[in-house]
Amino acid sequence: MLIRERQRDRVRQALDDVGLADLAPTEIVGEQSVATQQLIEVARALASDAKMILFDEPTSSLPQRDVQRLFEIIERLKQRGLGLVYISHFLEEVRRVADVYSVLRDGRHVDSGRIDDVTDPEIVSKMVGRNAVSYTHLTLPTNDQ
């Protein structure tokens, strides 16, 4: 019986960690929103004491408010020292959550490095598969100046 109680406690803690403390563990996952289903998957990994979590295009079907919530949870997981693999075609998302990047094209490793280097046009070209243009944002003077 003690083992079951520990398991329940871990499930409750995991649901709390992803902001779903009010969700009953017996609720049917398929009846939840897509965002809640994704958070349940993260909680499931946490409850099983995973050392690494894979996020594969996690924002592709989420409304913006849920995207922000997911990023907050990812940041907390990073602070706890969990290993995270974040797969996305959205460069800004990758830059927001990653410390390092790896580029795959057609199943092959093309490049990897520090996320701060992702502004380099050569690296961006490898990511998008075509030449990238670097530009500097200029502020033009108005008639008042």
Where are the regions a protein language model picked out?
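A short, hydrophobic C-terminal helix/tail in secreted or cell-surface proteins
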Residues: 139-145
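Glycine-rich phosphate-binding loops of nucleotide-dependent enzymes
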Residues: 1-138
